[in-house]
């Protein structure tokens, strides 16, 4: 097979936080088994051996959750041992970790640095904004622990970026959020839409990100980002980077920006494999990585069905002048009713207004970075 990328949940849906907007919590509540616990050593070895045997060129192991650090540092030390043991083809291996940061200490930071992990740190901005939705299981604030994790990453020279969930409150205070990240010298930022639970009415929660709020957020964030670009202080914002890739190359490296789905090979802690992080549901279970090859998993009828469903272009999109840039957006924002055709993207109007507002300046940036 070509290079392989896996998204792995070593602690299943387990987490030491109780974020109000957690999409994976709502997903796992709708499975026969809410949590599969910590990944066993035999599952880990089967997975590593499988990928290193079948991939060509390089492969990527991305650990997410739940909270992956709940698996323990020993789990990841075992991972490195197994990668060395089974990498007889001398593949280039990329490891990454998405964490809430609350369990990061000196030992973790040192390990991540020494083993060249790329780390995503979940942080929603300054204290009052972050703590609003990101409490621990006891209802306590988490900001100070996350800020401490960022300091440790800098101390040990861990390569990391910030993942910020955009809620209604974030959208209203984008100036505070961007200013805080800038003060902390965070140069790599990813802002992701807060998702209401799958197949529930959209916009009914206090945290829900409504289209009008998202429009304002995108415009204001772009203004700050563009001003910094003109002043020689370029900040990487994944969504804007994805748009620039689309302008310059015709497609983006970011999932959700190309209009159609691919198979992400999401691996739950019991070895079960799913096509997408947003659809880790019994309905879309492809099989188990312990007893099926990656090719067999990819060729399952369920995977083909999942991908095929994303190919239908909405009639409104076909006549939209921004379709080549937007491509309909992420399937998750088009999926409103179970077992129904995908609809127009929930944020369609937001994107239209944003593109009208920012496109000339996006072209200017693209021309300057060719």
Swiss-Prot record:
It comes from Clostridium perfringens (strain ATCC 13124 / DSM 756 / JCM 1290 / NCIMB 6125 / NCTC 8237 / Type A). One of its GO terms (molecular function) is metal ion binding. The lineage of its organism: Bacteria, Bacillati, Bacillota, Clostridia, Eubacteriales. The keyword Iron applies. Pathway: Protein modification; sulfatase oxidation. It catalyses: L-cysteinyl-[sulfatase] + S-adenosyl-L-methionine + H2O = 3-oxo-L-alanyl-[sulfatase] + hydrogen sulfide + 5'-deoxyadenosine + L-methionine + 2 H(+). Involved in 'Cys-type' sulfatase maturation under anaerobic conditions. Catalyzes the post-translational modification of cysteine ('Cys-51' in the arylsulfatase CPF_0221) into 3-oxoalanine (also known as C(alpha)-formylglycine (FGly)), by a free radical chemical mechanism initiated via the reductive cleavage of S-adenosyl-L-methionine (SAM). Is also able to oxidize a serine residue in a synthetic substrate to FGly in vitro, and in a serine variant of a Cys-type sulfatase in vivo, but this activity is not physiological. Pfam families: Fer4_12 (PF13353), Radical_SAM (PF04055), SPASM (PF13186). This is Cysteine-type anaerobic sulfatase-maturating enzyme. Binds 3 [4Fe-4S] clusters. The first cluster is coordinated with 3 cysteines and an exchangeable S-adenosyl-L-methionine. The two auxiliary clusters may create a conduit for electrons to travel from the buried substrate to the protein surface.
């Amino acid at each position: 097979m070509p290079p392989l990328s896996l998204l792995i949940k070593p602690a299943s849906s387990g987490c030491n936080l109780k974020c109000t907007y957690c999409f994976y919590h709502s997903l796992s509540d709708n499975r026969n088994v809410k949590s599969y616990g910590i990944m066993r050593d035999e599952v880990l070895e089967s997975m590593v051996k499988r990928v290193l045997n079948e991939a060509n060129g390089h492969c990527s192991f991305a650990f997410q959750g739940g909270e992956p650090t709940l698996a323990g540092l020993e789990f990841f030390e075992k991972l490195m041992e197994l990668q060395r043991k089974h990498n007889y083809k001398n593949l280039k291996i990329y490891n990454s970790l998405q964490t809430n940061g609350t369990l990061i200490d000196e030992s973790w930071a040192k390990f991540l640095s020494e083993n060249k992990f790329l780390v995503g740190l979940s942080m929603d901005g300054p204290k009052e904004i972050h703590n609003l939705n990101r409490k621990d299981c006891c209802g306590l604030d988490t900001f100070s622990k996350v800020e401490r994790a960022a300091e440790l990453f800098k101390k040990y020279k861990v390569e990391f970026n910030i993942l910020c969930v955009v809620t209604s409150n974030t959208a209203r205070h984008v100036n505070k959020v961007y200013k805080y990240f800038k003060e902390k010298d965070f140069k790599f930022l990813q802002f992701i839409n807060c998702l209401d639970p799958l197949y529930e009415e959209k916009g009914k929660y206090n945290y829900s990100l409504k289209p009008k709020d998202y429009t304002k957020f995108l415009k204001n964030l772009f203004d700050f980002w563009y001003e910094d670009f003109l002043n020689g202080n370029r900040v990487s914002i994944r969504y804007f980077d994805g748009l620039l890739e689309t302008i310059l190359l015709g497609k983006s490296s970011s999932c959700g920006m190309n209009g159609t789905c691919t198979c992400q090979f999401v691996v739950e802690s019991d070895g079960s494999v799913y096509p997408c992080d947003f659809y880790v549901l019994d309905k879309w279970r492809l099989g188990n990585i312990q007893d099926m090859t990656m090719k067999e998993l990819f060729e399952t009828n369920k995977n083909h069905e999942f991908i095929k469903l994303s190919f239908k272009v909405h009639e409104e999109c076909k006549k939209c002048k921004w379709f080549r840039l937007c491509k309909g957006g992420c399937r998750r924002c088009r999926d409103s009713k179970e077992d129904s055709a995908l609809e127009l993207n929930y944020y369609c109007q937001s994107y239209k207004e944003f593109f009208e507002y920012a496109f000339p300046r996006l072209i200017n940036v693209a021309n300057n970075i060719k």
